[in-house]
């Protein structure tokens, strides 16, 4: 899969964000092991704890459709700088992917960096720690 295609999908989902409080839109696109792609945007709520990030929206959508393993995720924020996933999203990405999951952090289809999951969440807490 071409990273630019995944970024393009994330950019499309970014425009769908529901952000009446922060005015900070984020889009994400997840490539699953099956080859299917799922997109998501951030969705805010007046009760801020009920807000959901774009990364989790995309991953939860994929899991709810029967996916269990992700290979890559593209994330596009609205800043002029690269937008990294929050700590909760890093943990969720780690739950459904290996240490080598590609995390594509983009400003545009032409301006992006690629990190392995192990770079952005070293020492991730995994199910094996629970004896699973």
Predicted segment positions?
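C-terminal binding/interaction regions
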Residues: 2-16, 67-132
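Short loop/turn motifs at secondary-structure junctions and domain boundaries
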Residues: 19-22
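Short beta-strand scaffold segments in enzyme catalytic cores
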Residues: 25-31
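Short beta-strand-to-turn element immediately C-terminal to the catalytic PLP-Schiff-base lysine
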Residues: 31-32, 106
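Hydrophobic "anchor" residues
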Residues: 36-37
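Local cysteine-cluster metal-coordination motifs and their immediate loop/turn environment
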Residues: 41-42, 49-56, 60, 81-96
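A short acidic/small-residue loop/turn micro-motif
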Residues: 45-46, 120
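Active-site- and interface-proximal helix/loop "cap" or "latch" segments in soluble metabolic
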Residues: 61-65
């Amino acid at each position: 899969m071409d990273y630019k295609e995944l970024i393009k999908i994330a950019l499309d989902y970014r425009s769908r964000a529901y952000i009446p409080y922060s005015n900070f839109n984020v889009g994400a696109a997840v490539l699953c092991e099956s080859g299917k792609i799922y997109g998501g945007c951030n969705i805010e709520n007046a009760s801020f704890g009920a807000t959901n990030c774009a990364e989790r929206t995309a991953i939860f959508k994929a899991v709810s459709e029967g996916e269990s393993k992700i290979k890559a995720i593209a994330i596009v924020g609205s800043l002029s700088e690269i937008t990294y996933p929050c700590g909760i999203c890093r943990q969720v990405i780690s739950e459904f992917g290996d240490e080598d999951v590609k995390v594509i952090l983009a400003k545009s289809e032409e301006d992006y960096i690629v990190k392995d999951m192990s770079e952005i969440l070293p020492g991730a807490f995994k199910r094996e720690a629970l004896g699973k």
